[in-house]
Regions:
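Amphipathic alpha-helical polymerization modules
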Residues: 1-134
Length: 134
């Protein structure tokens, strides 16, 4: 952690939010991806993050610790003419909650913007402190 701790903390939040946005974009892009019956259906990617504890109890930001797949069963849609239909005529749809992804998209976007606001405010505070010394 540098002397510009608030910048580092906010930057970690922005990185986590960007990873979250990337995962959401990937999930939305694959909302209609269908795979052959012998392959697992697409599952939404979930970003797993944890708080980074600081020695002084304040904390040092956030870290992405992994990407997991969403739980749940794929929706079975009867479409015997689809090339990926199983022997019973069912196609397994992706495990992606589009409405949930859109809600997460708004939250991730707001989180990213808030962290960038902290970066800007911290930078302005440091610049003001430097001007005092002149």
């Amino acid at each position: 952690m540098s002397v510009f701790r608030s910048l580092d903390i906010a930057a970690s939040g922005a990185r986590m939010s960007r990873t979250w946005l990337d995962a959401i974009a990937h999930n939305i892009a694959n909302v209609n991806t269908v795979r052959p019956p012998d392959e697992e259906p697409f599952r939404a990617k979930l970003v797993v993050a944890r708080a980074v504890e600081g020695a002084d109890g304040v904390g040092d930001g956030v870290a992405v610790v992994g990407i997991e797949e969403a739980p749940g069963d794929p929706a079975l849609v009867y479409d015997p003419t689809h090339p990926y239909a199983d022997e019973n005529g069912f196609v397994r749809r992706p495990v992606v909650d589009l409405a949930g992804q859109m809600a997460d998209l708004m939250a991730a976007q707001r989180s990213y913007q808030a962290n960038l606001s902290v970066v800007r405010s911290s930078r302005e505070a440091y610049e003001a402190a430097l001007r005092i010394g002149r």
